[in-house]
Amino acid sequence: MGAHLVRRYLGDASVEPDPLQMPTFPPDYGFPERKEREMVATQQEMMDAQLRLQLRDYCAHYLIRLLKCKRDSFPNFXACKQERHDWDYCEHRDYVMRMKEFERERRLLQRKKRREKKAAELAKGQGPGEVDPKVAL
């Protein structure tokens, strides 16, 4: 994850998305059949489980099951191994998906910059393979 810091400060920061901001491109851009991610746990369920705001993500329903299991089988902490595994695996998949979205955003920003540069060159009259008349003389 630290590679984005190197690219952001030492490379071209204009094509590096901000990891704390929402993506600028629509999620279905290039993927017409792509489904939007939906929360499984409702706001009321998360409030009833007293989840902190940092833990209210797409894996909150697994965390609610884990906390309920821990509460129901209190002295036996090893009884909730499967619930813990499910929550950890969901968090891992969510992390990987967010990193893929970050990379997708970065590549789309690079593509946008290349297209703008090409359009600016064509507006000047310097397309690919063309020579400026001043240079030709």
Curated annotation (Swiss-Prot):
Pfam families linked to this entry: NDUF_B7
Covalently attached lipid (N-myristoyl glycine), positions: G2
A GO molecular-function annotation: NADH dehydrogenase (ubiquinone) activity
Cystine crosslinks: C59-C90, C69-C80
Superkingdom to which the source organism belongs: Eukaryota
Motif (Cx9C motif 2): 80-90
Predominant subcellular localization, coarse grouping: mitochondrion
Localisation per UniProt entry: Mitochondrion inner membrane; Mitochondrion intermembrane space
Keyword Repressor: no
Chain residue ranges for the region called Disordered: 113-137
Motif annotated as Cx9C motif 1, chain positions: 59-69
Membrane-topology descriptor: Peripheral membrane protein
Phosphoserine PTM sites in chain numbering: S73
CHCH domain location: 56-98
The keyword Protein transport belongs to this UniProt entry's keyword annotation: no
Keyword terms of this UniProt record: Disulfide bond, Electron transport, Lipoprotein, Membrane, Mitochondrion, Mitochondrion inner membrane, Myristate, Phosphoprotein, Respiratory chain, Transport
Domain notes: Contains two C-X9-C motifs that are predicted to form a helix-coil-helix structure, permitting the formation of intramolecular disulfide bonds.
Cited function: Accessory subunit of the mitochondrial membrane respiratory chain NADH dehydrogenase (Complex I), that is believed not to be involved in catalysis. Complex I functions in the transfer of electrons from NADH to the respiratory chain. The immediate electron acceptor for the enzyme is believed to be ubiquinone.
Family: Belongs to the complex I NDUFB7 subunit family.
Name of the protein: NADH dehydrogenase [ubiquinone] 1 beta subcomplex subunit 7
Source species: Pan troglodytes
Gene it is expressed from: NDUFB7
